[in-house]
């Protein structure tokens, strides 16, 4: 009877990879790359959801009679947006004020809301808060027709509006001129004081 051929058995386990081998390093890099890819994907989805929620709020609070918004109107709408959690914060404060409750309840939710509002308020006061471009009639019309589909977000034009946009241009120009004048006076004072110091040092 012929002998069975020697060789690897069908059920033999796979060869163990040495933890410090190049193959192990390659597998580790591939796993890290996949994890990073999933991380970025989740971050993008979360960011899109947050943008979608913001745009949905603005669409729900548009004045149906307006065909276009002025900068002042847009600023007033943003002020309402920044106060959108007021009633919820009041409810949290009311629940926490009960004497029979020990410790603060809903503290994580309250902290998240306040952190979000502080960040948005800083953006609005500084370089501007990004909102749908409701100042342009065509862009406003497109935004009104949006059906909350996140895939259609690229079709919605955005623009930044800051708190100073509520001030008329004439007032802003006057304020800028005054500030520039004050800065000029300060520079002249600094130069004169430097000259005096140099003369004193030489003497």
Curated annotation (Swiss-Prot):
The keyword Metal-binding does not apply. Keywords: ADP-ribosylation, Nucleus, Ribosome biogenesis. InterPro entries: Tma16, Tma16_sf. Residues 1-40 are annotated as: Disordered. GO terms for cellular component: nucleus. One of its GO terms (molecular function) is preribosome binding. The modification ADP-ribosylserine is found at residue 9. It is found in: Nucleus. Associates with pre-60S ribosomal particles. This is Translation machinery-associated protein 16. The lineage of its organism: Eukaryota, Metazoa, Chordata, Craniata, Vertebrata.
